[in-house]
Regions:
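Active-site substrate-recognition segment that forms the wall
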Residues: 203-342
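Helix-loop-beta segment of a Rossmann-like dinucleotide-binding subdomain
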Residues: 126-170, 275-276, 342-350
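C-terminal catalytic lobe of FAD-dependent flavoproteins
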Residues: 300-398
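Beta1/beta-strand and adjacent pyrophosphate-binding region of the FAD-binding site
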Residues: 2-16
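Dinucleotide-binding Rossmann-like beta1-alpha1 core, especially the glycine-rich loop
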Residues: 49-133
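Helical element adjacent to the flavin cofactor pocket in flavoenzyme catalytic cores
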Residues: 143-200, 204-210, 357-366
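Glycine-rich FAD pyrophosphate-binding loop
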Residues: 25-46
């Protein structure tokens, strides 16, 4: 394959695939993206939209590999929001330009000193009560401001799609449609005289990577799924709140992680994660709702929760397999290893929404380190496929 049609075929239209397509296109790479269903319809639109700098991974009272791997990401995203760098997010409004952490004052213990330490300077700030956000004005406790912020994931996907929409298609790919060789990849489409050729295959399909790894005979890396059981809350008294509650935590994870969203009915919806979601995977929906009410009464006692409407949402976080199924610290990019197709293939999981820029950086470096023949044309390649459409947030029909 001396002159392929494409530099790369990207599989998966969530945050990883769309960010990567924008990044590579801005560098002059000729790529298309294939999405099996709707853009962002897996994990991206079910995420809380937090762009965070790792403080929640340091709640044990010390910096960790996870907290430092992600520390620069808020600045990376703000660069994109300013229209600078390889991915242009200018014009995208954020849901909240600051995130907060709150706790009953007596429950922080040694974290009080850690939060005030030089190691966290510029990343967390204790606030005076007049500076508390509207959602915590009635809170009698300690509030910190973080450098983190929150994006509207639907608006984010729409902004990422805008400059590359002529390169994004819907196709539920099977292993039989792809054939790899030392020279690259061939994608066989119905009613086409010849296959579409590409130098590389970039798998960014989240949970969809798992079946593709098997279909392509790729032995390493492998995938793991870590489940969550999130909670959606509607209540007429809700004010916008974007905050971690760490009152009385006994392990380094927020008790509740709260984001606020338009519920599609003219009101505000709270979306709850944190320990509630990770511990809740073994609870039924009714048990999780009962437990969530107890946690809300404990953490947000100034609201009468008796009239709240609660629903739950189960999500699987797709990641590279880790020892004992633990949480990976960094975005993951690795060349495929196996006895199936020998074509150049990178397996990608951002592991967190915030780390999408880092994933794209890693892929761009890998491509630069292993140059391949330039495509026959630098014009957008029109495929005989329908366009992939953006998905919906999971509460839009709830």
């Amino acid at each position: 394959m001396t002159s392929p049609d494409l530099d790369a075929i990207i599989i998966g239209g969530g945050i990883a695939g769309l960010w990567l397509l924008n990044h590579l296109t801005s560098e002059g790479h000729h790529c298309v993206l294939l999405e099996a269903d709707t853009l962002g319809g897996g994990q991206t639109l079910a995420s809380q939209g937090m762009i965070h700098g790792g403080i929640k991974y340091a709640l044990g009272g010390a910096l960790t590999g996870a907290s430092e791997a992600i520390a620069d990401m808020p600045d990376r995203w703000r660069t994109a929001l300013a229209g600078e760098g390889p991915v242009d997010l200018s014009g995208l409004d954020v849901l909240a330009d600051r995130y907060y952490l709150f706790a009953e004052g007596s429950s922080l213990g040694r974290l009080t000193g850690f939060f005030a330490s030089r190691a966290l300077r510029g990343r967390i700030e204790r606030l005076d009560p007049p500076a508390y956000p509207a959602g915590l004005r009635n809170f009698d406790g300690v509030v910190y401001g973080l450098q983190d912020f929150v994006v509207d994931t639907q608006a984010l996907l729409a902004r990422l799609l805008q400059p590359v929409q002529d390169r994004v298609y819907r196709l539920r790919l099977t292993g039989e449609q792809l054939s790899g060789s030392e020279g690259g990849w061939a994608l066989n489409l119905p009613d086409q005289e010849r296959p579409v050729t590409a130098s590389r295959l970039l798998l960014c399909a989240g949970a969809g990577n798992g079946p593709l790894l098997d279909a392509l005979g790729i032995e390493q890396p492998r995938m793991q799924l870590r489940p969550l059981h999130q909670v959606l809350v509607r209540h007429p008294a809700l004010a916008p709140l974007f905050a971690h509650c760490v009152t009385g935590i006994r392990r380094p994870e927020p008790r509740l992680t709260i984001t606020s969203h338009d519920d599609g009915q003219g009101g505000i919806l709270w979306y709850l994660g944190g320990q509630l979601a990770t511990d809740g995977v073994d609870r039924s929906e009714s048990e999780q709702i009962d437990h969530a009410r107890k946690e809300l009464r404990r953490c947000v006692p100034w609201i009468d929760w008796s009239g709240a409407e609660l629903k739950t949402l189960r999500i699987d976080r797709a990641e590279p397999a880790q020892a004992r199924g633990g949480r990976p610290d960094e975005a993951f990019v690795q060349s495929a290893i196996g006895h199936g197709h020998p074509g150049k293939c990178l397996i990608c999981w951002p592991t967190k929404l915030s780390l999408a820029p880092d994933l794209a950086d890693q892929v761009a470096r890998a491509l630069a380190a292993d140059p391949t023949p330039a495509p026959a044309s630098d014009q957008a390649l029109e495929l005989p496929l329908p366009s992939a459409e953006p998905g919906k947030v999971p509460w839009s029909d709830s």
